[in-house]
Each structure stands twice: as structure tokens, then as C-alpha cells.
A protein has these predicted regions:
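Active-site adenylate/phosphate-handling loop in enzymes that bind or generate adenylated species
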Residues: 133-135, 172-179, 250-251, 255-328, ...
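A short alpha-helix-loop-beta-strand transition element characteristic
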Residues: 334-342
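S-adenosyl-L-methionine
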Residues: 233-234, 238-261
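RNA-binding accessory domains that recognize and position tRNA/RNA substrates
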Residues: 1-183, 193-239, 248, 308, ...
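Small/polar glycine-rich anion-binding or flexible loop at a beta-alpha turn
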Residues: 294, 342-350
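Conserved G/P- and acidic residue-centered "switch" motifs that form tight phosphate/ATP-binding loops
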Residues: 189
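Structural beta-sheet core signal
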Residues: 184, 208-210, 243, 288, ...
């Protein structure tokens, strides 16, 4: 019975003169999401509302599922919309709507009319009262409750009239692309895909870089990361995944540097490489899944040491999350089951038994100096031979 959806948004509504830019971005994201659904749809905005009108047969559950992944949407309202053929005809439509959506017809209700078209002959208060009277006459077992109704019956009077009573939750946030672009350091673990999701929710378009270490990490480990990128892409749109062969760099660091500093020094080179790719692709920052104190490389001292090599800002959406909170988000967005597949990352292969937790930046720099010009050549080769994979849902 539903042929349209009214899209609600929250934060966009408090924007100033540039609000239309955010609305236009949200319309684009909705159109992109619906391309993967059966059917034809018209997406349009009018007077602080965005509507999705189905122009052919469609799968209701499929459309709702795709809309619930579009950042910027706070609510999705399946609506019945009709032409204005007079108030009596509107009452008949509403009574029929209640019979189909709430067949028991014994709930409490409230009518909430919004008259966006000011030349409509009844004002909002009169619509509420007259419609309530018609409903009570048709369904004597129903009762009015203006404070805590079972059914909030919304009627929007525009060029057409829209009727809805259900608001399905959206993901919230801001439309992807309105917050700039960032480079995500993506691994096969639980944290980094969640970090990508969280930063994208704030409107940031993400690319990603993955550090692969064959033969120490398998093709299955690489495919796992590609699969994670595809899952995150359900929410973000296509992700350009840059795959770096990190093996020679890791082996050289392992040979030349103290083993307790391996993780920090390797991490610093990952940040350098990610930043170089980020600058080439017009990213405004790096994004990681780090959380304070979770592992040795994520103490505040360690984060200072890794930040020191970057000119771009480093965004850490999970910095104050504990592990269980991160797991809960990963389960919600669908990455958890893939993240726990038992394929090793490059960071887990070359791990010291006793990694330093309070690295001294001056000491780290001195040990990096031992890597001489060869490390620059290895980095250059890694960048020249990187693989680009476009991950789409």
C-alpha cells in the first residue's frame, strides 16, 4: 500500500544558508543507494522535506534496508499520498489506512496535521479535531491520547497530501562527502572498519590503504580486507582501496632496528606511506582505528611517536571506546564475523615479545637513521607497485 517514503533528517535542519548543499548531498546519496534496488524511484526535496516516490513495483524491505544505510537520514516514514479531493475524501483515505495498518482498530491515537499549503481551507488544529472525530465515528473502540498515543497519525498538507504513522530509524549523521575526504588505514581486525564507519557517519568520504606482507600474510588475508571494505562501502559508497606490499620494508626494519621498537617504527612508515597516498588523492587527514591503551602501540606516548611523522591530521574516531563498545558497533554494521576470520595481518606477524609502551621519539629517530637511504628506495618501490581495488557493496 505504501508508494512513497518521507525522509527525515536531524542535523541538516539546523544548518544555515548552506543547508541546501547538505540536502542536495543527501538526495544524491539516496539516489545512489536506490540504484541497487529493483524499481524506479523519483527522489525530490520540497520545503524542508525529502520524498522518495516509487514509479514502479518495488521490494519494500529492500528499499528500507538500503535507506537505513544512508548517513544523514534520521527517520524513514512509509507514506500514502493522495490528491486533494476534499476533506471528506481525505477522511475516507485515513480510515482505510488505519484499517490496513492497524486491523485491530482498538489503539489510542493522536492526529498531527501539518498544513504546509496555507490555502487549504482548514487550519491544522481544525484538521486534527475533525479527523479525530471521523476516526472515532468509524472505530468506536479507538481512543484519543494526546500525550502517549499508540498511533501518531501524521497528515502533511502539500500540493498532495501525505499520511504516515510509522517512523523507521535511520543511521543519523551527515551525508557522505559533506565533511571532506580521509585516508583510512584498514586492516583485517575489528577496529579499523568501525573507525571508517564512524568517520563516514560524520560526512567524511573515505579511501583506504591496506598493508599486505606476502608470503607472511596470505591472499585470504588480503581478500578478507577487501570483503571488509565492501561491507563498509554499503554505508559510504565505493571505497578506493590501495594495497601496499609491505614485506621488504618490514624485513629491513626487522633487520636494522631494536625488536622492542618494531611495531612503532613499522607504524611510522605505514603512516608516512598512507599520508603520501592521501596527499596524492586530495585527502584532508588520516583515519585509524586506534583506542588509547588497547595495545602497546596505542599508548599516548606511542600515539605521539606515530603522529610525529605526519603533516596531515590523524583522526581516531574510536579513541575513547573500549573493546566491547567497538565489537557492538562491528556487529551492528556487519563487519564482525569477517573481522574474526583467522587470517594474520602484517602487524601481527612481526610482533616483539616485549614491545616498548613509552617510546622516546629522539631514540626512535636515531634508530630510523640506521635504515639509511635503502628504506626510501623500498618505500618508493612499494608506492610504485601498489594495487588499486575499488570496493563496492
Amino acid at each position: 500500500m505504501f508508494t512513497s517514503f518521507l525522509i527525515k533528517y536531524a542535523e541538516i535542519g539546523i544548518k544555515g544558508k548552506n543547508r541546501y548543499l547538505f540536502e542536495d548531498a543527501l538526495v544524491r546519496q539516496i539516489k545512489y543507494a536506490l540504484k541497487k534496488c529493483e524499481g524506479e524511484f523519483l527522489v525530490h526535496k520540497t520545503q524542508g522535506r525529502i520524498f522518495v516516490d516509487a514509479e514502479s513495483e518495488f521490494d519494500y524491505d529492500e528499499v528500507v534496508a538500503h535507506l537505513q544505510r544512508v548517513f544523514g537520514i534520521s527517520g524513514i516514514c512509509p507514506v500514502v499520498h493522495v490528491q486533494d479531493e476534499g476533506f471528506e475524501k481525505l477522511c475516507e483515505t485515513v480510515i482505510d489506512y488505519i484499517a490496513k495498518v492497524y486491523p485491530d482498530c482498538n489503539q489510542t491515537f493522536k492526529v498531527a496535521a501539518r498544513r504546509a499549503r496555507k490555502n487549504y481551507p482548514k487550519d491544522s488544529m481544525t484538521i486534527n479535531m475533525d479527523m479525530g472525530e471521523a476516526i472515532l465515528k468509524a472505530y468506536p473502540n479507538m481512543k484519543v491520547d494526546i500525550h502517549h498515543p499508540d498511533i501518531m497519525l501524521n497528515i502533511e498538507i502539500r500540493e498532495e497530501i501525505y499520511i504516515y504513522s510509522v517512523i523507521l530509524p535511520g543511521p543519523g549523521g551527515m551525508p557522505v562527502g559533506t565533511g571532506g575526504k580521509g585516508m583510512l588505514l584498514l586492516s583485517g581486525g575489528i577496529d579499523s572498519p568501525v573507525a571508517g564507519y564512524m568517520i563516514a557517519k560524520r560526512g567524511v568520504k573515505i579511501d583506504a590503504v591496506y598493508f599486505h606482507a606476502p608470503p607472511y600474510t596470505s591472499e585470504r588475508a588480503k581478500q578478507k580486507v577487501v570483503d571488509l571494505a565492501k561491507i563498509v562501502a554499503r554505508y559510504t559508497g565505493p571505497i578506493y582501496l590501495h594495497v601496499i606490499n609491505f614485506t621488504d620494508i618490514q624485513l629491513y626494519i626487522y633487520e636494522k632496528c631494536p625488536h622492542e621498537e618494531l611495531t612503532i617504527i613499522m607504524r611510522r612508515y605505514m603512516m608516512r606511506i598512507a599520508e603520501q597516498i592521501g596527499k596524492e588523492t586530495e585527502c584532508l587527514g588520516l583515519i585509524t582505528g586506534e583506542s588509547i591503551g588497547q595495545v602497546a602501540s596505542q599508548t599516548m606516548n606511542s600515539l605521539i611517536a606515530t603522529n610525529e611523522v605526519c603533516e596531515l591530521p590523524v583522526y581516531r574516531p574510536l579513541i575513547g571506546f573500549d573493546k566491547q563498545e567497538i565489537v557492538e558497533v562491528s556487529e551492528k554494521i556487519g563487519t564482525y564475523e569477517t573481522s574474526i576470520l583467522p587470517y594474520e595481518d602484517c602487524c601481527t606477524i612481526f610482533v616483539a615479545k616485549h614491545p616498548v609502551t613509552k617510546p622516546n621519539v629522539k631514540v626512535i629517530r636515531r634508530h630510523e637513521h640506521n635504515l639509511d637511504e635503502k628504506i626510501d628506495e623500498l618505500v618508493k618501490t612499494a608506492l610504485e607497485t601498489k594495487e588499486l581495488i575499488i570496493a563496492e557493496a
